[in-house]
Amino acid sequence: MVENPMVINNWHDKLTETDVQIDFYGDEVTPVDDYVIDGGEIILRENLERYLREQLGFEFKNAQ
């Protein structure tokens, strides 16, 4: 019996699949996501305000 690599590798080709990246808050980063890198940490754009506030002490205010 011939061993099929698709069956052996759980139907995935490990050589052509990209590694999944995880941002600072544990969210998966896909190739189409917008993100920033700060000191080696990946932060998704939707988590950026939270990161700036919690990690860097930024204060966001409204001009009123």
Swiss-Prot record:
InterPro entries: Uncharacterised_Yqai, YqaI_dom_sf. This is Uncharacterized protein YqaI. It comes from Bacillus subtilis (strain 168). The lineage of its organism: Bacteria, Bacillati, Bacillota, Bacilli, Bacillales. The gene is yqaI.
